[in-house]
């Protein structure tokens, strides 16, 4: 039997899809297909963080229903499934079952139940996260927690994924070792609020925090890098920052969601910090790791956002000079406190879109400047892809600080670690020259993120 799966949204959804694929392969003997007309089972793993993907869902269901072969089943999974539940089947009778984000481990059970709806956000089966860690190549994903307790005023995730529960450390270490034994060089730790790890465990467990987990995982033989997403700024204490800086296995690229640079808007968002607190944490981080790569999320057009509020956000963008930016216009979501705001508090779509364009244009200018400053710098690159044919030869991978670097005229083995000098950039993309290949021990000892010239201005963020 054949499975077609469409995954929308975040890395957590990608991981959930990988789990369902493995469950269906191992227990029901399904194989993947990219041709929907051949599929016996069609899964749509959905996202509900913004309204647009939810609206698009029903048109996609209709299209799939027309294309599918007779007898093929359609299942809707993920956060939109948690949010809308039975409403999905009422609006789209061609859907055979609905499976919430917290319930993906039940995928093989619901197949035989007509019009099954499983959307229990309190369901606790944290062991499911291990079902498909192996065989993922040089980069493996590992869920260390599920759910979120934060209740930010704009975010529907606590409603769709439930309360926060951490996976016991010994289980994580055991699974991480299996990933490395299967060829993984890099682990991506996943959690809705990943650095709040340890707040609540699925069963009795000694007290452990995120920093202690990172330290334990980094001791696994053969592991080159650990990345994680997404942390919350509030849990970036000094113990964590010092471990992040000093531990060579922890990649020196980090995503730190800002959401807004306005202290007033941050208060309305229930983020728990203000503009200056955020900047102080960034200043501390950059003092420890000068060339750290920092990504962020920003929402523009949040209710009551004034021009000055927006300018505060632009100022933070200019000061921090984020390496990656995920930016969106505010999308009101049911089951959030911001959804109840009076319509008079909303920013007009025209103003919000104009602000988003200004924000993104400023970020493009920042990236262009930073790309020029990279020329001549040395990075250790974990090779993720290569190509040799039709008169072209190149390899591609990421540095510790998460910079995507293309190496021209050299085919490097996927999974190898190579030293690269940045020679130029094309359209903001970094191009480099192969210097030499490194052993794992050589790469961990070189600390390329300290060897490069520092381009931040001391005290600029204080």
From Swiss-Prot:
Residues binding [4Fe-4S] cluster 1: 10, 47, 79
Cofactor stoichiometry and binding remark: Binds 2 [4Fe-4S] clusters. One cluster is coordinated with 3 cysteines and an exchangeable S-adenosyl-L-methionine.
Domain TRAM: residue ranges: 372-436
Name of one Pfam family that matches: UPF0004
Chain ranges of the MTTase N-terminal domain: 1-116
Residues that, per the record, bind [4Fe-4S] cluster 2: 148, 152, 155
Principal location listed in the UniProt entry: cytoplasm
Regions crossing the membrane: none
Listed cofactors: [4Fe-4S] cluster
EC nos: 2.8.4.3
Assembly and interaction partners: Monomer.
Protein family (similarity comment): Belongs to the methylthiotransferase family. MiaB subfamily.
Official protein name in the record: tRNA-2-methylthio-N(6)-dimethylallyladenosine synthase
Species in which this protein is naturally found: Helicobacter hepaticus (strain ATCC 51449 / 3B1)
Gene name linked to the record: miaB
């Amino acid at each position: 039997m054949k499975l077609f799966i469409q995954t929308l949204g975040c890395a957590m959804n990608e991981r959930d899809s990988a789990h369902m694929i493995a469950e269906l392969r191992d227990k029901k003997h399904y194989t993947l297909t990219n041709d929907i007309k051949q599929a016996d089972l069609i899964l749509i793993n959905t996202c509900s963080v913004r309204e647009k993907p939810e609206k698009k869902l029903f048109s996609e269901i209709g299209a799939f229903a027309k294309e599918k072969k007779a007898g093929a089943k359609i299942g809707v999974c993920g956060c939109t499934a948690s949010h809308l539940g039975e409403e999905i089947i009422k609006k789209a009778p061609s859907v055979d079952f609905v499976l919430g984000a917290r319930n993906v481990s039940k995928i093989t059970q619901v197949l035989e139940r007509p019009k099954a709806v499983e959307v229990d956000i309190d369901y606790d089966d944290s062991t499911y996260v291990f079902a498909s860690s192996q065989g993922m190549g040089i980069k493996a994903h590992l869920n260390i927690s599920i759910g979120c307790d934060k209740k930010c005023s704009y975010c529907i995730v606590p409603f769709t994924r439930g309360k926060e529960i951490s996976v016991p450390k010994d289980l994580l270490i055991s699974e991480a070792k299996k990933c490395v034994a299967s060829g993984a060089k890099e682990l991506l730790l996943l959690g809705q609020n990943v650095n709040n790890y340890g707040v609540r465990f699925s069963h009795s467990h000694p007290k452990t925090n995120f920093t202690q987990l990172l330290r334990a995982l980094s001791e696994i033989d053969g592991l080159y890098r650990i990345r994680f997403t997404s942390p919350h700024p509030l849990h970036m204490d000094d113990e964590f920052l010092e471990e992040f800086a000093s531990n060579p296995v922890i990649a020196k690229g980090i995503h730190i969601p800002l959401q807004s640079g306005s202290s007033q808007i941050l208060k309305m968002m229930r983020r728990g910090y203000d503009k200056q607190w955020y900047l102080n944490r960034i200043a501390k981080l950059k003092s420890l790791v000068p060339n750290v790569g920092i990504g962020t999320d920003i929402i523009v057009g949040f209710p009551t956002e004034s021009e000055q509020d927006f300018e505060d956000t632009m100022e933070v963008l200019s000061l921090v000079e984020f390496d990656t930016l995920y930016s969106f216009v505010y999308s009101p979501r049911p089951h959030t406190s911001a959804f109840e705001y009076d319509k008079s508090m909303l920013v007009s779509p025209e103003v919000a879109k104009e602000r988003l364009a200004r924000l993104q244009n400023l970020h493009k200018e920042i990236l262009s400047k930073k790309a020029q400053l990279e020329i001549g710098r040395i990075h250790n690159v974990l090779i993720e892809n290569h190509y040799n044919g039709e008169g072209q030869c190149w390899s591609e991978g990421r540095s510790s600080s998460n910079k995507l670097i293309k190496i021209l005229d050299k085919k490097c083995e996927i999974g190898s670690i190579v030293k690269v000098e940045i020679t130029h950039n094309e359209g903001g993309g970094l191009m480099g020259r192969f210097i030499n290949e490194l052993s794992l021990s050589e790469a961990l000892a070189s600390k390329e993120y300290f060897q490069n010239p520092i381009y931040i201005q001391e005290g600029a963020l204080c």
